[in-house]
Amino acid sequence: FNSPLAESSIIGTAIGLAVTGYKPVVEIQFADYIWTSMMQIRNEVVTMRYRSNNLWECPLIIRAPVGGYINGGIYHSQSIDGYFMHMPGILIAYPSNASDAKGLLKMACRLKDPVIFMEHKGLYRQGYASSLEPDSDYLLPFGKGNIITSGDELTIVAWGAMVHKTIEAIKSLGLDER
C-alpha cells in the first residue's frame, strides 16, 4: 500500500508490520532522506533481537537508492553505506548488476533479519549493469564476494557501481592481460 512521504512513518509502519508477521519491503525514495527515520532504525529495527534475547525478530527490507551520477546535488547523491556498515543487527545488500540484485532481493525476502538494500542510481538503465540470471530460482547468499580477477600484487574491494569503475581501471592499466 502507499504511505505518506515521511520516512520515519514509512519505517515505523514497516516495523509494526514486521513484528506482527508480515514481510514488508519499503522504499526510501532517495537514501539521502533516510536520516529522519534513523531513530526508528537504530533503536527499534536493529536492536529487536538483542532487546528480546533473540525472541523477537523484525524481518523487513528497506530499499534505498544511493549514490550520484545523476546530477542530483546534495539531496539526491549521498552514499549511506559507510554508516550502515558499522551498525550491528542489519544486513546490507549492495549489488553491482541486475542478476545479483534479483538474487540478493529474493534471499532477503527469505531471511528473518532486517536488510538494507542499497541500489546505486548510477546503475539504473545501464547496459553494463545488465546480466543474465543463472536461473529463475537464483538466490545469492549474503556474505559472499565475487572475484573478478585474481593476482598477488593488489586487492581491491568494491561494491555497487564502483565494481564497474574498478573493472574499467583494471582494463585501462592492462592488469586483465596478465
Could you describe each region identified by the protein language model?
Residues F1-N2:
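Short pre-catalytic strand/loop immediately N-terminal to key active-site residues, enriched for Gly-Thr
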Residues Y83, K165-R178:
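Short helix-loop-beta junction
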Residues A6-S9, I15-V157, M162-K165:
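Conserved thiamine diphosphate
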